[in-house]
Amino acid sequence: MQFSRIIVYGYPRTGSMWVYNILREIVQLCRYDIIPKRIPKSDKEMLKIHKNNLDIKNKKIISIIKVHTLLDKYQLKDAFIFMTKRDPRDSLISYMRFMKVKNLDITRKLEHISSYIDSVKHLRNTINSQFFLEIDYKDITLRPINLIMKILNFLKIDLKEDQIIDISKKYSKDSVKKMIEKKDLNIKKKLAKNKKVSNNEVVIMSPDNIRAFDENTGFQSNHVSNYKDGDWNDILTSDEIEEINSKFEAWIEFNN
């Protein structure tokens, strides 16, 4: 591969975790060693790994990180960059559900969408397009095999058809949901019996919000939801929709 670093950037709830795992599978099938071996829980940990590997000399080692934090030009140098994108009205509602935020005023909703748009603009203005691939959330959900082939083409990597199908099945919505639900049930059983739970098994958001965590993939409880794109139409109030669309609809329509 041309570069020994791959960076996946995604605003929360835009599909970056799926892309991250697809890339890890691809790189391992090509017989590269990947770092990190286990998935960190935070951007801070991810960025520490990235910083420590800015000057990798071993061409058989590939550093792959996923962040929500915007990086500067130096941090983005000599790397393949993948950015996931989604209608920010959908990512907003999905984020609120994932974080169990029931009440978010319109000001903070507008800030969420504005921040998403700023992040997209930042990356588009910072990165050499030759090494930058934008990934639409709809392709993740509707055309995963075609998307995997697109990623392979971008990286100039060939895999067999059955390998591509296997990757797609492994990270299908149903497969990931079953995997994390199994871990979630195991954590709940341990807690119910007052058994010790390893820090590597959970993400503690609050005493009432403890999520199972899979350190092999980074997926957490409720990472896969039953939310359907477009549901924001039925969840946001008519006044909220009017205000959001008056500010952002033109940009959203042009960029989605």
What would you call each of these model-derived segments?
Residues I65, F80-M83, L133-I135:
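Hydrophobic/aromatic beta-strand patches that form the interior of the parallel beta-sheet core
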Residues L71-A79:
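Short loop/helix-cap segments at secondary-structure boundaries that form the rim of catalytic
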Residues I93-D166, D174-I180, D184-I187:
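PAPS-dependent sulfotransferase catalytic domain
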Residues M1-I64:
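PAPS-dependent sulfotransferase catalytic core
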Residues P12-T14, T69-D72, D87-S91, R97-F98, ...:
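Short, solvent-exposed loop/turn segments at secondary-structure junctions
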Residues D78-M96, I244:
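Conserved phosphate-donor/acceptor-positioning beta-strand/loop module used by diverse small-molecule
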Residues M17, K66-T69, H223:
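Histidine-centered active-site/metal-ligand motif
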Residues M1-I6, G10-P12, R124, I157-N256:
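PAPS-dependent sulfotransferases, especially Golgi type II membrane carbohydrate sulfotransferases
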